[in-house]
């Protein structure tokens, strides 16, 4: 398990490229027949991926000592979205079929969570976020059809996109975790522009569905002190509450967003006009 500390905005704006990447970029999300795990001190979110190819992969129980618990989800909830082939998630003996672009919410207290692929030639790829939880809500599978969609932007501004909200209060109850998948319309390259911050929660962007030559210029930093990260396929960016989070790709891409904090109201954000950015 990698650990990322919180960082003050005054410190962040002094970092060079290597420093920004070290603090905010998660370069490797998937490893065959294993899971990855990055623990951020920012709202205590955990981010990672599970790639079961030739065997099932159980997540996280060996990190109990680092988390101060006897098993991974003793005091946490988890959301996973499959971006690969058809897969299975078994939660304490109950099996869920999770296809491409389908999600599973797992409530606090689940003792064993096991991930597997149906076809090793086309393995499932489960991207997950986990957040501290104070109570137990029911496990729930969410399909793309069951997600709450919202289309924003315009072709003229190259930012037309559909925000598919999988794990939000309109779809199911959680303690604090929210997750969704945003698809850009053909020809659109910008996400979340005009941009925003949200003081009451942090966010992680996971970029995928990109070929080897594609990169996303991910904008971050305070609105008057912007910086950027070059992000490639299947990499994630941690965004503190004080930072904008927006990106433009050299070609098409898709991304999953996950938020943790004290407020789950999707529209609770502070919008920033493009003219105000520096």
Curated annotation (Swiss-Prot):
A molecular function GO annotation: metal ion binding
Cofactor dependence is on: Zn(2+)
Q: Name the Enzyme Commission number(s) assigned to this protein.
A: 5.3.1.17
Alphabetically list the UniProt keywords. Answer: Isomerase, Metal-binding, Zinc
Which positions does UniProt annotate for Zn(2+) binding? 196, 198, 203, 245
Which family, according to UniProt?
Belongs to the KduI family.
Entry function: Catalyzes the isomerization of 5-dehydro-4-deoxy-D-glucuronate to 3-deoxy-D-glycero-2,5-hexodiulosonate.
Stated name of the protein: 4-deoxy-L-threo-5-hexosulose-uronate ketol-isomerase
The organism is Yersinia pestis
Gene from which the chain derives:
kduI
């Amino acid at each position: 398990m990698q650990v990322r500390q919180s960082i003050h905005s005054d410190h962040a704006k002094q970092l060079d490229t290597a420093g920004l990447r070290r603090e905010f970029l998660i370069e490797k999300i998937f490893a065959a027949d294993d899971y990855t795990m990055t623990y951020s001190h920012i709202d205590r979110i955990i981010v990672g991926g599970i790639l079961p190819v030739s065997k099932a992969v159980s997540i996280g129980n060996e990190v109990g000592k680092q988390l101060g618990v006897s098993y991974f989800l003793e005091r946490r909830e988890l959301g996973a979205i499959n971006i690969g082939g058809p897969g299975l998630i078994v939660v304490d003996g109950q099996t869920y079929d999770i296809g491409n672009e389908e999600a599973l919410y797992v409530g606090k207290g689940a003792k064993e969570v096991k991930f597997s692929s149906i076809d090793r030639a086309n393995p499932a790829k489960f991207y997950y976020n986990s957040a501290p939880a104070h109570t137990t809500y029911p496990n729930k599978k969410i399909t793309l059809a069951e997600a709450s969609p919202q289309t924003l932007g315009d072709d003229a501004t190259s930012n037309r996109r559909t925000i598919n909200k999988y794990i939000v209060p309109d779809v199911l109850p959680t303690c604090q975790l929210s997750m969704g998948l945003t698809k850009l319309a053909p020809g659109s390259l910008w996400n979340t522009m005009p941009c925003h911050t949200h003081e009451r929660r942090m966010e992680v962007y996971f970029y995928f569905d990109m070929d080897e030559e594609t990169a996303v210029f991910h904008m971050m930093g305070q609105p008057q002190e912007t910086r950027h990260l070059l992000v490639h396929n299947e990499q994630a960016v941690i965004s503190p509450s004080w930072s904008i989070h927006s990106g433009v790709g050299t070609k098409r891409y898709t991304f999953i967003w996950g938020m943790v904090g004290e407020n789950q109201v999707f529209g609770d954000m502070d919008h920033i006009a493009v003219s105000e950015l520096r």
